[in-house]
Amino acid sequence: MSENRIRIATRKSPLAMWQAEFVKAELERIHPGIVVELLPMSTKGDVILDTPLAKVGGKGLFVKELEVAMLDDLADIAVHSMKDVPVDFPEGLGLEVICEREDPRDAFVSNLYKSISELPLGATVGTSSLRRQCQIRASRPDLIIKDLRGNVGTRLAKLDNGEYDAIILAAAGLIRLKLSERIASFISAEESLPANGQGAVGIECRINDERVKALLAPLEHLETRYRVLAERAMNTRLEGGCQVPIGAFAEIDGDEMTLRGLVGNPDGSEIIEGVITGPKTEATQLGVALAEELLSKGAKSILDAVYAKA
Protein backbone atom coordinates (compact mmCIF):
# COMPACT_ATOMS: atom_id res chain seq x y z
CA MET A 1 0.00 0.00 0.00
CA SER A 2 1.32 3.42 -0.96
CA GLU A 3 2.37 5.51 2.05
CA ASN A 4 0.35 8.32 0.53
CA ARG A 5 -2.99 6.60 -0.05
CA ILE A 6 -5.92 5.71 2.17
CA ARG A 7 -9.15 3.89 1.25
CA ILE A 8 -12.37 4.61 3.16
CA ALA A 9 -15.18 2.05 3.32
CA THR A 10 -18.57 3.72 3.79
CA ARG A 11 -22.26 3.07 3.47
CA LYS A 12 -23.97 4.65 0.45
CA SER A 13 -26.61 6.73 2.23
CA PRO A 14 -26.28 10.52 1.88
CA LEU A 15 -25.49 10.90 5.59
CA ALA A 16 -22.87 8.12 5.56
CA MET A 17 -21.31 9.67 2.45
CA TRP A 18 -21.23 13.06 4.22
CA GLN A 19 -19.34 11.47 7.12
CA ALA A 20 -16.84 9.80 4.78
CA GLU A 21 -16.37 13.02 2.79
CA PHE A 22 -15.80 14.88 6.07
CA VAL A 23 -13.03 12.47 7.08
CA LYS A 24 -11.57 12.63 3.54
CA ALA A 25 -11.47 16.44 3.66
CA GLU A 26 -9.87 16.44 7.12
CA LEU A 27 -7.18 13.97 6.03
CA GLU A 28 -6.46 16.05 2.91
CA ARG A 29 -6.28 19.23 4.99
CA ILE A 30 -3.92 17.75 7.58
CA HIS A 31 -1.79 15.70 5.15
CA PRO A 32 -1.30 17.69 1.91
CA GLY A 33 -0.74 15.41 -1.07
CA ILE A 34 -2.48 12.38 0.43
CA VAL A 35 -4.74 10.41 -1.95
CA VAL A 36 -8.05 9.44 -0.31
CA GLU A 37 -10.46 7.06 -2.06
CA LEU A 38 -14.06 6.33 -1.05
CA LEU A 39 -15.47 2.81 -1.37
CA PRO A 40 -19.28 3.06 -1.00
CA MET A 41 -21.09 -0.21 -0.19
CA SER A 42 -24.45 -1.49 1.03
CA THR A 43 -24.90 -3.15 4.42
CA LYS A 44 -27.60 -5.52 5.65
CA GLY A 45 -29.24 -2.63 7.52
CA ASP A 46 -29.46 -0.63 4.29
CA VAL A 47 -31.07 -3.48 2.34
CA ILE A 48 -33.71 -4.69 4.83
CA LEU A 49 -36.01 -1.68 4.92
CA ASP A 50 -39.42 -3.32 5.29
CA THR A 51 -38.84 -4.61 8.82
CA PRO A 52 -38.49 -2.66 12.09
CA LEU A 53 -34.88 -2.56 13.31
CA ALA A 54 -35.85 -4.23 16.57
CA LYS A 55 -37.16 -7.25 14.62
CA VAL A 56 -34.21 -7.45 12.21
CA GLY A 57 -32.11 -7.93 15.34
CA GLY A 58 -28.41 -8.60 15.55
CA LYS A 59 -25.66 -6.11 16.19
CA GLY A 60 -23.54 -4.55 13.49
CA LEU A 61 -26.31 -4.30 10.89
CA PHE A 62 -24.72 -1.18 9.44
CA VAL A 63 -21.02 -2.03 9.80
CA LYS A 64 -20.27 -5.71 9.09
CA GLU A 65 -19.69 -5.38 5.33
CA LEU A 66 -17.34 -2.45 5.93
CA GLU A 67 -15.36 -4.51 8.43
CA VAL A 68 -15.02 -7.40 5.98
CA ALA A 69 -13.57 -4.96 3.42
CA MET A 70 -10.88 -3.92 5.91
CA LEU A 71 -10.05 -7.49 6.92
CA ASP A 72 -9.73 -8.39 3.22
CA ASP A 73 -7.44 -5.37 2.70
CA LEU A 74 -9.86 -3.77 0.25
CA ALA A 75 -10.17 -0.73 2.53
CA ASP A 76 -7.94 0.87 5.17
CA ILE A 77 -10.57 2.51 7.37
CA ALA A 78 -14.34 2.59 7.85
CA VAL A 79 -16.30 5.65 8.94
CA HIS A 80 -19.33 5.05 11.16
CA SER A 81 -22.07 6.87 12.99
CA MET A 82 -21.14 5.89 16.56
CA LYS A 83 -24.69 4.95 17.51
CA ASP A 84 -24.52 2.15 14.89
CA VAL A 85 -21.23 0.69 16.12
CA PRO A 86 -21.46 -2.55 18.15
CA VAL A 87 -19.53 -2.93 21.38
CA ASP A 88 -17.33 -5.78 20.15
CA PHE A 89 -15.05 -5.60 17.13
CA PRO A 90 -13.84 -8.46 14.93
CA GLU A 91 -10.36 -9.71 15.78
CA GLY A 92 -7.79 -7.38 14.25
CA LEU A 93 -10.04 -4.31 14.09
CA GLY A 94 -10.64 -1.48 16.55
CA LEU A 95 -12.08 1.99 16.99
CA GLU A 96 -9.07 4.23 16.47
CA VAL A 97 -10.63 7.72 16.39
CA ILE A 98 -13.79 9.46 17.60
CA CYS A 99 -14.27 12.84 15.91
CA GLU A 100 -15.80 15.92 17.52
CA ARG A 101 -19.49 15.47 18.25
CA GLU A 102 -22.29 17.30 16.46
CA ASP A 103 -25.52 18.19 18.34
CA PRO A 104 -26.54 14.91 20.03
CA ARG A 105 -30.22 15.77 20.54
CA ASP A 106 -33.27 14.37 18.80
CA ALA A 107 -35.13 16.69 16.44
CA PHE A 108 -38.91 17.12 16.13
CA VAL A 109 -39.80 17.49 12.44
CA SER A 110 -43.27 18.52 11.31
CA ASN A 111 -44.86 20.76 8.70
CA LEU A 112 -47.81 21.53 10.98
CA TYR A 113 -46.69 21.53 14.60
CA LYS A 114 -43.81 23.06 16.57
CA SER A 115 -43.27 20.40 19.25
CA ILE A 116 -44.50 17.10 20.68
CA SER A 117 -46.62 19.00 23.20
CA GLU A 118 -48.45 20.78 20.35
CA LEU A 119 -49.50 17.55 18.64
CA PRO A 120 -53.27 16.93 18.79
CA LEU A 121 -54.71 13.85 20.48
CA GLY A 122 -54.12 10.71 18.44
CA ALA A 123 -51.57 12.29 16.08
CA THR A 124 -49.26 9.95 14.16
CA VAL A 125 -45.52 10.10 14.85
CA GLY A 126 -42.87 8.26 12.84
CA THR A 127 -39.73 6.75 14.37
CA SER A 128 -38.07 3.33 14.20
CA SER A 129 -36.18 3.85 17.47
CA LEU A 130 -37.59 1.99 20.49
CA ARG A 131 -35.73 4.48 22.70
CA ARG A 132 -37.67 7.38 21.16
CA GLN A 133 -40.94 5.44 21.11
CA CYS A 134 -40.64 4.58 24.80
CA GLN A 135 -40.02 8.17 25.89
CA ILE A 136 -42.74 9.62 23.66
CA ARG A 137 -45.28 7.06 24.90
CA ALA A 138 -44.40 7.84 28.51
CA SER A 139 -45.23 11.53 28.05
CA ARG A 140 -47.93 11.24 25.36
CA PRO A 141 -49.64 7.81 25.51
CA ASP A 142 -52.39 9.09 23.18
CA LEU A 143 -50.06 9.38 20.19
CA ILE A 144 -49.97 6.72 17.46
CA ILE A 145 -46.38 5.73 16.75
CA LYS A 146 -45.60 4.12 13.40
CA ASP A 147 -42.32 2.62 12.26
CA LEU A 148 -40.17 4.76 9.96
CA ARG A 149 -37.20 3.35 8.02
CA GLY A 150 -35.01 4.57 5.17
CA ASN A 151 -32.47 7.34 4.78
CA VAL A 152 -33.15 10.92 5.87
CA GLY A 153 -34.53 11.99 2.49
CA THR A 154 -36.91 9.03 2.35
CA ARG A 155 -38.19 9.76 5.85
CA LEU A 156 -38.78 13.44 5.09
CA ALA A 157 -40.63 12.49 1.89
CA LYS A 158 -42.96 10.21 3.87
CA LEU A 159 -43.71 13.10 6.23
CA ASP A 160 -44.34 15.45 3.31
CA ASN A 161 -46.66 12.88 1.71
CA GLY A 162 -48.87 13.02 4.78
CA GLU A 163 -48.08 9.57 6.18
CA TYR A 164 -47.19 11.14 9.54
CA ASP A 165 -48.07 14.29 11.47
CA ALA A 166 -44.48 14.44 12.72
CA ILE A 167 -41.29 12.41 12.68
CA ILE A 168 -38.33 12.23 15.06
CA LEU A 169 -34.81 12.24 13.63
CA ALA A 170 -31.29 12.76 14.98
CA ALA A 171 -30.56 16.48 14.82
CA ALA A 172 -26.95 15.79 13.79
CA GLY A 173 -27.98 14.14 10.52
CA LEU A 174 -30.21 17.03 9.50
CA ILE A 175 -27.54 19.59 10.38
CA ARG A 176 -24.85 17.73 8.42
CA LEU A 177 -27.08 17.39 5.35
CA LYS A 178 -27.87 21.12 5.53
CA LEU A 179 -31.51 20.40 6.34
CA SER A 180 -31.65 22.34 9.62
CA GLU A 181 -34.62 24.33 8.33
CA ARG A 182 -36.70 21.14 8.56
CA ILE A 183 -36.26 21.05 12.35
CA ALA A 184 -39.40 22.43 14.01
CA SER A 185 -37.75 22.15 17.43
CA PHE A 186 -34.90 20.41 19.21
CA ILE A 187 -35.99 17.88 21.83
CA SER A 188 -34.03 18.43 25.04
CA ALA A 189 -32.09 15.56 26.58
CA GLU A 190 -34.43 15.86 29.58
CA GLU A 191 -37.42 15.15 27.33
CA SER A 192 -35.77 12.49 25.15
CA LEU A 193 -32.44 11.07 26.31
CA PRO A 194 -30.29 10.46 23.19
CA ALA A 195 -28.81 7.14 22.09
CA ASN A 196 -25.27 6.33 23.15
CA GLY A 197 -22.82 7.93 20.73
CA GLN A 198 -25.52 9.92 18.93
CA GLY A 199 -24.03 12.72 16.82
CA ALA A 200 -20.47 11.34 16.93
CA VAL A 201 -18.47 9.90 14.02
CA GLY A 202 -16.03 7.05 14.65
CA ILE A 203 -13.20 5.68 12.51
CA GLU A 204 -12.38 1.97 12.61
CA CYS A 205 -9.18 0.44 11.23
CA ARG A 206 -6.84 -2.54 11.52
CA ILE A 207 -5.23 -2.33 14.96
CA ASN A 208 -1.78 -3.32 13.62
CA ASP A 209 -1.76 -0.71 10.82
CA GLU A 210 0.59 1.87 12.33
CA ARG A 211 0.77 3.91 9.10
CA VAL A 212 -2.99 4.48 9.02
CA LYS A 213 -3.23 5.06 12.78
CA ALA A 214 -0.62 7.83 12.55
CA LEU A 215 -2.54 9.51 9.72
CA LEU A 216 -5.79 9.35 11.71
CA ALA A 217 -4.44 10.55 15.07
CA PRO A 218 -5.05 14.31 14.51
CA LEU A 219 -8.79 13.68 13.95
CA GLU A 220 -9.28 12.43 17.53
CA HIS A 221 -11.42 14.65 19.81
CA LEU A 222 -10.64 13.63 23.38
CA GLU A 223 -13.68 15.16 25.10
CA THR A 224 -16.02 13.40 22.67
CA ARG A 225 -14.16 10.13 23.28
CA TYR A 226 -14.66 10.42 27.05
CA ARG A 227 -18.38 11.10 26.59
CA VAL A 228 -18.91 8.28 24.11
CA LEU A 229 -16.82 5.82 26.15
CA ALA A 230 -19.04 6.40 29.19
CA GLU A 231 -22.25 6.04 27.18
CA ARG A 232 -21.03 2.87 25.43
CA ALA A 233 -19.76 1.35 28.69
CA MET A 234 -23.22 1.72 30.20
CA ASN A 235 -24.81 0.17 27.12
CA THR A 236 -22.29 -2.69 27.12
CA ARG A 237 -22.98 -3.60 30.74
CA LEU A 238 -26.72 -3.57 29.97
CA GLU A 239 -26.11 -5.71 26.85
CA GLY A 240 -28.11 -3.16 24.89
CA GLY A 241 -29.18 -3.59 21.27
CA CYS A 242 -31.89 -2.44 18.89
CA GLN A 243 -34.52 -4.46 20.76
CA VAL A 244 -34.31 -2.43 23.97
CA PRO A 245 -35.08 1.23 24.72
CA ILE A 246 -31.82 2.47 26.26
CA GLY A 247 -30.71 6.09 26.43
CA ALA A 248 -27.32 7.39 27.57
CA PHE A 249 -25.96 10.92 27.55
CA ALA A 250 -22.72 12.26 29.04
CA GLU A 251 -21.78 15.91 29.53
CA ILE A 252 -18.44 17.34 30.67
CA ASP A 253 -17.82 20.43 32.79
CA GLY A 254 -14.12 20.96 33.37
CA ASP A 255 -12.75 17.65 34.64
CA GLU A 256 -16.15 16.38 35.81
CA MET A 257 -18.49 14.18 33.81
CA THR A 258 -22.21 13.77 34.41
CA LEU A 259 -23.76 10.69 32.80
CA ARG A 260 -27.50 10.12 32.61
CA GLY A 261 -29.06 6.85 31.55
CA LEU A 262 -32.41 5.14 31.19
CA VAL A 263 -33.91 1.77 30.40
CA GLY A 264 -37.58 1.53 29.52
CA ASN A 265 -40.37 -0.74 28.46
CA PRO A 266 -41.04 -0.30 24.73
CA ASP A 267 -44.64 0.66 25.54
CA GLY A 268 -43.47 3.46 27.84
CA SER A 269 -45.22 1.97 30.86
CA GLU A 270 -42.03 1.91 32.93
CA ILE A 271 -38.80 3.90 32.69
CA ILE A 272 -35.84 3.39 35.03
CA GLU A 273 -33.53 6.42 35.18
CA GLY A 274 -30.26 7.26 36.88
CA VAL A 275 -27.45 9.82 36.96
CA ILE A 276 -23.82 9.65 38.07
CA THR A 277 -21.01 12.20 38.32
CA GLY A 278 -17.26 11.66 38.49
CA PRO A 279 -13.88 12.35 36.85
CA LYS A 280 -14.06 12.30 33.04
CA THR A 281 -10.88 10.20 32.97
CA GLU A 282 -12.90 7.40 34.61
CA ALA A 283 -15.51 7.42 31.83
CA THR A 284 -15.73 3.65 31.43
CA GLN A 285 -16.04 3.03 35.17
CA LEU A 286 -18.80 5.65 35.41
CA GLY A 287 -20.73 3.97 32.60
CA VAL A 288 -20.50 0.56 34.26
CA ALA A 289 -21.45 1.99 37.66
CA LEU A 290 -24.54 3.71 36.25
CA ALA A 291 -25.57 0.51 34.49
CA GLU A 292 -25.28 -1.37 37.79
CA GLU A 293 -27.46 1.28 39.46
CA LEU A 294 -30.12 0.95 36.74
CA LEU A 295 -30.06 -2.84 37.03
CA SER A 296 -30.51 -2.64 40.80
CA LYS A 297 -33.46 -0.25 40.35
CA GLY A 298 -35.35 -2.74 38.17
CA ALA A 299 -33.85 -2.47 34.71
CA LYS A 300 -32.86 -6.14 34.81
CA SER A 301 -36.48 -7.32 34.83
CA ILE A 302 -37.29 -5.04 31.87
CA LEU A 303 -34.29 -6.30 29.91
CA ASP A 304 -34.99 -9.94 30.73
CA ALA A 305 -38.60 -9.58 29.57
CA VAL A 306 -37.61 -7.88 26.31
CA TYR A 307 -34.89 -10.42 25.47
CA ALA A 308 -37.21 -13.31 26.33
CA LYS A 309 -39.52 -12.13 23.53
CA ALA A 310 -36.69 -11.51 21.04
Swiss-Prot record:
Additional detail: The porphobilinogen subunits are added to the dipyrromethane group.
Positions of post-translational S-(dipyrrolylmethanemethyl)cysteine modification: C242
Reactions catalysed according to its record: 4 porphobilinogen + H2O = hydroxymethylbilane + 4 NH4(+)
A single GO cellular-component term on record: cytoplasm
Family matches, as Pfam families: Porphobil_deam, Porphobil_deamC
GO biological process, one term: protoporphyrinogen IX biosynthetic process
Top-level taxonomic group: Bacteria
Cofactor descriptive note: Binds 1 dipyrromethane group covalently.
Keyword field: Porphyrin biosynthesis, Transferase
Gene giving rise to this polypeptide: hemC
Pathway: Porphyrin-containing compound metabolism; protoporphyrin-IX biosynthesis; coproporphyrinogen-III from 5-aminolevulinate: step 2/4
Classification via PROSITE patterns: PORPHOBILINOGEN_DEAM (PS00533)
Self-association state and partner proteins as the record states: Monomer.
One function term, GO molecular function aspect: hydroxymethylbilane synthase activity
Enzyme Commission no: 2.5.1.61
Similarity comment: Belongs to the HMBS family.
Its job: Tetrapolymerization of the monopyrrole PBG into the hydroxymethylbilane pre-uroporphyrinogen in several discrete steps.
Cofactor field: dipyrromethane
UniProt-listed InterPro entries: HemC, Porphobilin_deaminase_cofac_BS, Porphobilin_deaminase_N, Porphobilinogen_deaminase_C, Porphobilinogen_deaminase_C_sf
Name of the protein: Porphobilinogen deaminase
